[in-house]
């Protein structure tokens, strides 16, 4: 099928996981006038029991989520606060109560979080849309056409069960993961 006329945006982010959605949110918070399009190949919402790399934050990540992205309320209400890094040394023991544990014994000044990625990504998908980002799931990117001059870049995509579409933007960011 022949692609329809391209939609025009300031930024296209390919990938609607943790990296793509947090970047979209940060861009909208910093530059509210930007037209941001996020393309995600999987259907949303994702399963809540979704295990991926990045489930455990460190303090600088928590600072980013809370203060740069303004997600403190979500973290406090829906995620599990933790005491920073913890190390366990088995010393040949199989019983967890018998192993050596090294880590903070009280809350740190800046908390860190054990993040449930499914819940977090679903929240981020909803939040970016509340902030005016266009979020398109089930969008399989077929090709990029990167401009060599000041012309916009083009992304061609296929919607599951739909037609071939294209979008153009000054910036195209690959946050598609592996």
Tell me what each language-model feature is.
Residues 26, 46, 127-178:
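Predominantly flavin-linked oxidoreductase catalytic cores and closely associated redox partners
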């Amino acid at each position: 099928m022949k692609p329809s006329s391209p939609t025009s945006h300031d930024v296209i982010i390919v990938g609607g996981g943790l990296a793509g959605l947090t970047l979209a949110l940060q861009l909208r918070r910093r530059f509210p006038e930007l037209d941001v399009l996020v393309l995600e190949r999987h259907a949303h919402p994702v399963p809540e029991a979704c295990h991926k790399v990045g489930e455990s934050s460190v303090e600088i990540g928590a600072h980013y989520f809370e203060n740069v992205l303004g997600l403190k309320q979500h973290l406090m209400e829906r995620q599990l606060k933790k005491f920073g890094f913890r190390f366990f040394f088995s010393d040949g023991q199989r019983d967890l109560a018998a192993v050596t544990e090294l880590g903070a014994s009280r809350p740190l000044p800046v908390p860190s979080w054990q993040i449930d990625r499914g819940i977090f990504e679903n929240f981020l998908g909803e939040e970016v849309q509340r902030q005016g980002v266009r979020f398109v799931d089930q969008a399989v990117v077929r090709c990029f056409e990167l401009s060599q001059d000041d012309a916009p870049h083009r992304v061609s995509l296929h919607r599951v069960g739909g037609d071939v579409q294209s979008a153009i933007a000054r910036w195209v960011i690959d946050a598609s993961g592996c």
